[in-house]
């Protein structure tokens, strides 16, 4: 794994529509399938595709982990409807680093990012999420780009 570059940035509030997933984080694809079906049915266009993680897998049993398959949407579409929940990711200070390559390598990039944060003296708190910067339907796995965000104190 190449070295991780951590940026500290201020992130604006994000309005999201989401589908909750309970269970191992690597199984969130089921929630994304529901999310994509709902968005297609409702004709809602996503501004960004996200996966939001609520629990620390080192502290919570895999079967109880909470995550959301989510999309950032305009204020006009920020309503709970059908199987979608309206939520917000609060504005704040975040550490951000980039993963390039197949999603199967994300776990190693998360771990390397947390090690780099520790070396920089950054303390994680609150929400963390992934933002998928390109479309896996028309991007080779080696070229996929994912931004990882961890709220910091």
Predicted regions and their residues:
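A solvent-exposed interaction/effector surface
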Residues: 1-153
């Amino acid at each position: 794994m190449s070295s991780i570059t951590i940026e500290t940035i201020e992130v604006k509030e994000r309005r999201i529509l989401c589908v909750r997933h309970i269970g191992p984080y690597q199984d969130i694809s089921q929630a994304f399938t529901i999310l994509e079906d709902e968005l297609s049915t409702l004709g809602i266009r996503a501004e960004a595709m996200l996966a939001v993680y609520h629990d620390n897998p080192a502290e919570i049993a895999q079967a109880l982990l909470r995550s959301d398959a989510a999309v950032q949407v305009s204020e006009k579409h920020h309503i709970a409807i059908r199987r979608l929940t309206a939520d917000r990711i609060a504005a704040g200070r975040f550490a951000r680093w980039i993963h390039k390559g197949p999603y199967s390598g994300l776990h190693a990039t998360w771990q390397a990012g947390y090690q780099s944060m520790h070396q920089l003296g950054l303390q994680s708190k609150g929400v963390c999420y992934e933002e998928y910067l390109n479309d896996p339907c028309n991007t080779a796995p080696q070229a996929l780009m994912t931004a990882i965000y961890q709220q910091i104190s």
